[in-house]
Amino acid sequence: MSKRDYYEVLGVERGASEADLKKAYRRLAMKYHPDRNPGDKESEDKFKEANEAYEVLSDASKRAAFDQYGHAGVDPSMGGGGAGFGGANFSDIFGDVFSDFFGGGRGGGRGGAQRGSDLRYTLELNLEEAVRGTTVSIRVPTLVNCQPCDGSGAKKGSTPSTCPTCGGIGQVRMQQGFFSVQQTCPRCHGQGKIITDPCTSCHGEGRVEEYKTLSVKVPAGVDTGDRIRLSGEGEAGTHGGPTGDLYVVISVREHEIFQRDGKHLYCEVPISYTDAALGGELEVPTLDGRVKLKIPEGTQTGKQFRLRGKGVAPVRGGGAGDLLCRVAVETPVNLSRRQRELLEELRDSLEGDSSHSPKASGWFDGVKRFFGDL
């Protein structure tokens, strides 16, 4: 029986886009999948036919050959790529959500043994957790070996068949004009074997989507951008390939009091007008608790005090940084009549004596010189 045109099988125009092909194939695959039609030979044949059509049309080189030469361009007996059950990338069709999460396709298809992809997980911590270290539990979506087929992709009790396209050697010779080029077999991807009876749990992929719960020990002193590598906790490899790694990337949330710059911490300390003028002592917060800070008389806004060793001990070793407290002098508001009278008396007593406000006096002298030079 002659094969139907692949575009006709999928029900699309010859100029259909990749998205249109995928949509059409997904619709047919869901409709005729053996799991949904157990024992229905006609549905199984239609499923295989749709699978074969999509394998060819979703591959740019195979599609070009089919468009130019028809079925002869992709017939294994003619030295082309060939098509058949087991070629379509089910992870691409049924795994859009996970593909988006991991930032792209999964690659590999049903090729040779390949290492699993590395995964990235962003872990948010507060400043105290980052400085002191902590242990957290995370839940990560990943791909693990399919248990029913033990990662082989083949239905239990079945075995992969010799690839009819390359005869089991994993290479094909393509004739391009006067030249003959040897390349990796596009059907078995160099394995020499193909899965003709795929596992219904993983659709022949050998891997299934699953959430994994892991305990992550975060060392003290980490900062935003630091990475913790968990070896072997990434995606499972394909066809016996090694498992990838999981990289936990640290992101430290903003703190309501402290700002961090490397191993040093910074904070702003508001003090009263009178404490700034007369001096005093106040308590300031640190990550280890409150400490007393002595304020000398005549302290101005912007004055910075250093508390040594009250910063962060870097994760890569070395002494702890410092806590730098920047003073912000608050002007009194909501004054009572008596308070206002006292301040007016103070202002009158200071008027004409520049020694009490050296910075202001110098600034006004500069202004006078500026206008005098105009």
UniProtKB/Swiss-Prot annotation:
| Subcellular compartments | Cytoplasm
The organism's superkingdom is given as Bacteria
Task: Specify the J domain's residue ranges.
Answer: 5-70
First and last residues of every CXXCXGXG motif repeat: 146-153, 163-170, 185-192, 199-206
Q: Which UniProt keywords apply?
A: Chaperone, Cytoplasm, DNA replication, Metal-binding, Repeat, Stress response, Zinc, Zinc-finger
Q: Where are the zinc fingers (CR-type)?
A: 133-211
Q: Name one GO molecular function term.
A: unfolded protein binding
**Does the keyword Metal-binding feature in the UniProt annotation?**
yes
How the cofactor binds, per note?
Answer: Binds 2 Zn(2+) ions per monomer.
Q: Which Gene3D superfamilies match?
A: DnaJ domain, Heat shock protein DnaJ, cysteine-rich domain, Urease metallochaperone UreE, N-terminal domain
Q: Which CDD domains match?
A: DnaJ, DnaJ_C, DnaJ_zf
Residue positions binding Zn(2+) 2: 163, 166, 185, 188
Which cofactors does it use?
Zn(2+)
Q: Which Pfam family is one of this chain's hits? A: DnaJ_C
Main location group: cytoplasm
UniProt xrefs under InterPro entries: DnaJ, DnaJ_C, DnaJ_domain, DnaJ_domain_CS, HSP40/DnaJ_pept-bd, HSP_DnaJ_Cys-rich_dom, HSP_DnaJ_Cys-rich_dom_sf, J_dom_sf
Cite the record's note on assembly. Homodimer.
The name under which this protein is listed is: Chaperone protein DnaJ
Query: Where does this protein come from, organism-wise?
Result: Pseudomonas putida (strain GB-1)
Organism placement in taxonomy: Bacteria, Pseudomonadati, Pseudomonadota, Gammaproteobacteria, Pseudomonadales
